Amino acid sequence: MLVIPAIDLQSGRCVRLKQGRFDQVTQFSVFPIERALHFAKLGAKRLHVVDLDGARSGKMQQLELICSMQKTGIPIQAGGGIRSIEQALECSSAGISQLVIGSLAITNTDLTIQIIEKIKPENIVLALDVRVDTKVPLLAINGWQNNSTSSLWEVVSYYENYGIKNILCTDIACDGMMNGPNFDLYQQAVEYFPQIAWQASGGIRHMQDITTLGSLGISAVILGLMLYQDNVSFEELLC
């Protein structure tokens, strides 16, 4: 299983949101490039970077900073406001390893398909963030500010027809809470779509959570707030 550190950016700083709420932001003193270099030295194989300003505004705001983070040598999967072919191509040309497409996959399927065809499916990660309502995982969009009526299963089934294999799924209720991930959700995801390389995010607390997710068939975990805790060794998580 791949262990991927997450770096969320807001106004050029490293931050974390609680349950995706922009009014519950924790800002960290470390600078993003220093944070990326730190993970590079510890042996990280990939970084997950989110431009929260872009996710909220609908247009990526911090591509220059993300490109600077790439100079650490770690492949980056990045998203937050990629909502046009032009911006997708700009990110790809800048060397971003995989583009993370979120809200657009729900709000504009035609444009998303065009991006997939231009960039190639293997270079895309669909980020599908859900709120579980009466056991049905419904998707949230626009930096989690709005809810959609589309279910996770409907959207995955649709894009699978276009070659998408990499999907990052977050249960918003777990994100930033450090109470554990939604194991039932990920178990269902792997059972319904075993051919998808699922990435799990939200609520992961310790090595046992990661081990359990691996036993369910999850391909990668995204670690955010957990890696800011003093008692967590990223090097040990890689072992």
Swiss-Prot record:
Pathway given for this chain reads: Amino-acid biosynthesis; L-histidine biosynthesis; L-histidine from 5-phospho-alpha-D-ribose 1-diphosphate: step 4/9
User: What are the UniProt keywords, alphabetically?
Assistant: Amino-acid biosynthesis, Cytoplasm, Histidine biosynthesis, Isomerase
The protein's Enzyme Commission number: 5.3.1.16
Give a GO cellular-component term. cytoplasm
Name the catalytic site residues: 8, 129
Q: Which GO terms describe its biological process?
A: L-histidine biosynthetic process; L-tryptophan biosynthetic process
Q: Which domain of life is it from?
A: Bacteria
Q: What is the official name of this protein in its record?
A: 1-(5-phosphoribosyl)-5-[(5-phosphoribosylamino)methylideneamino] imidazole-4-carboxamide isomerase
Principal location listed in the UniProt entry: cytoplasm
Does this UniProt record's set of keywords contain Ion transport?
Answer: no
Q: Extract the GO molecular function terms from the UniProt entry.
A: 1-(5-phosphoribosyl)-5-[(5-phosphoribosylamino)methylideneamino]imidazole-4-carboxamide isomerase activity
Bridged cysteine pairs (disulfide): none
Keyword Isomerase set for record: yes
User: Which family does the UniProt entry place this protein in?
Assistant: Belongs to the HisA/HisF family.
Q: Which organism is it from?
A: Legionella pneumophila (strain Corby)
- Cellular compartments annotated: Cytoplasm
Give the catalysed reaction(s), semicolon-separated: 1-(5-phospho-beta-D-ribosyl)-5-[(5-phospho-beta-D-ribosylamino)methylideneamino]imidazole-4-carboxamide = 5-[(5-phospho-1-deoxy-D-ribulos-1-ylimino)methylamino]-1-(5-phospho-beta-D-ribosyl)imidazole-4-carboxamide
What's one Pfam family the UniProt record gives for this protein? His_biosynth
